[in-house]
């Protein structure tokens, strides 16, 4: 067994390589390094066996059993493995799983190949994560969080992108030095420190009119963030402060309701407004983010959080696809939640909103929601769950960083007595 420090390209990311009497297995980390191990009878290896190999190789404490899990991850699908799952056989069924749980074309499925990834356990509660002090654990959590930021899954306040880029620069580029760190250095590396939607140039007539700002605004703000945090650690050895910096990065993300979530491909219907005839598509492509505290919906085109609802305010139900000869129907998840709404007369009333979220992965979404809620119920009754989950997060904390954008979704409204207000 050896630890691979080099980065891997997508073509090199192969989980299993068969040998005459054994199986070569590669387990990847979110920092693009991997652990390569040769196993006798590797075809029969369970996720729990491979998990222990990672703990040993990385020098992680046994308590990490709750913090991390093994996943099969590809551009099309992400699956958390249970302890008794056998990854080799899961990979053999990958085309079938992608056909069932994604809307990908046959050639996309044929070209898709999963990697075995060691990453955060979706059932590990954020309330327990904030107490972690072990540097190696924080490092792994940091790299996964950074991945989610750069992939555009974690939608943040604009100023925080620069702060996080400054922390990342201090960790990877060392302290700011005016001789070495010039504006061109930052401009050439934007894609490694920011999600695309932050630095990409808008297109179209309306976009050009909105983007009348200094061209170097992002580079300059990143440079300033790097310089500022470097000044804070001016007299410190950065290598001795890495654990503190990993934690500092994570602290900016913990308040967001989607932190630590599993992300599912989905879409919702657009509301039909006065200019509805101009819209080319009636759907909004979304991420549905589900964690131990609630459900979030993220607009993937506009990179904004549309909805964040804690389980304390949520009801849900699976909807079978309504097959139509001329329509490729999708299963869906019905999300029902309470909101305060003002009538045209200015009177505030309590109503129920229902949103349909369409996804090939709807059954997986429902299963994850119900598993998270069931674990919380067991804990409240004093019964330890298989994956330990802390108590409910308060609804105010869940909403702290996000404002629900109800007007941007196609919602059905009911009164508390059950009357449909859309009719």
Regions found by a protein language model. Name each.
Residues 2, 60-64, 74-113:
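Eukaryotic mixed-charge, acidic/polar low-complexity intrinsically disordered regions
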Residues 2-14, 19-34, 147, 153-156, ...:
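N-terminal recruitment modules of adaptor/scaffold proteins
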Residues 29-52, 309-310:
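Short, contiguous acidic and Ser/Thr-rich linear segments
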Residues 46-71:
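Classical protein tyrosine phosphatase
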Residues 71-79, 169-174:
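Short, conserved secondary-structure transition motifs
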Residues 89, 99, 103, 117-119, ...:
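C2 and C2-like phospholipid-binding beta-sandwich domains
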Residues 110-126, 136-144:
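Elongated alpha-helical scaffolds
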């Amino acid at each position: 067994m050896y630890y691979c420090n080099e980065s891997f390209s997508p073509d090199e990311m192969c989980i299993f390589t068969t040998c005459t009497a054994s199986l070569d297995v590669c387990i990847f980390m979110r920092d693009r390094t991997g652990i390569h191990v040769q196993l006798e009878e590797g075809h029969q290896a369970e996720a729990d066996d491979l998990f222990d190999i990672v703990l040993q190789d990385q020098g992680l404490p046994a308590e990490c059993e709750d913090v991390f899990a093994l996943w099969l991850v590809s551009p099309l699908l992400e699956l958390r493995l249970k302890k008794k799952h056998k990854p080799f056989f899961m990979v053999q069924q990958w085309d079938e799983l992608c056909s069932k749980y994604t809307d990908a074309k046959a050639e996309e499925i044929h070209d898709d190949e999963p990697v075995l990834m060691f990453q955060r356990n979706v059932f590990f509660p954020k309330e327990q994560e904030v107490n972690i002090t072990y540097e190696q654990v924080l490092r792994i959590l940091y790299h996964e969080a950074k991945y989610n930021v750069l992939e555009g899954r974690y939608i943040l306040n604009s100023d925080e992108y620069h702060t996080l880029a400054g922390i990342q620069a201090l960790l990877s580029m060392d302290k700011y030095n005016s001789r070495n760190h010039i504006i061109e250095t930052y401009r050439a590396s934007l894609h490694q420190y920011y999600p695309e939607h932050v630095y990409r140039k808008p297109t179209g007539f309306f976009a050009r009119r909105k983007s009348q700002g200094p061209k170097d605004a992002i580079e300059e703000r990143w440079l300033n963030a790097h310089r500022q945090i470097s000044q804070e650690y001016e007299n410190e050895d950065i290598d001795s402060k890495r654990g503190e910096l990993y934690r500092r990065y994570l602290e900016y993300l913990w308040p967001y309701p989607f932190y630590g979530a599993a992300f599912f491909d989905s879409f919702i219907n657009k509301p039909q407004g006065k200019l509805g005839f101009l819209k080319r598509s009636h759907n909004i492509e979304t991420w549905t983010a589900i964690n131990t505290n609630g459900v979030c919906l993220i607009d993937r085109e506009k990179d904004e959080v549309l909805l964040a609802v804690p389980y304390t305010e949520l009801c849900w139900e699976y909807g079978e696809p309504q097959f139509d000869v001329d329509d490729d129907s999708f299963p869906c998840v019905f999300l029902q939640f309470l909101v305060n709404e003002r009538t045209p007369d200015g009177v505030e009333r309590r109503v129920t909103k229902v949103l349909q979220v369409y996804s090939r992965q709807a059954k997986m979404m429902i299963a994850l929601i119900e598993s998270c809620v069931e674990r919380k119920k067991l804990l409240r009754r004093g019964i330890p769950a298989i994956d330990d989950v802390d108590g409910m997060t308060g609804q105010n904390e869940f909403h702290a960083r996000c404002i629900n954008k109800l007007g941007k979704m196609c919602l059905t409204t009911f009164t508390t007595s059950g009357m449909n207000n859309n009719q």
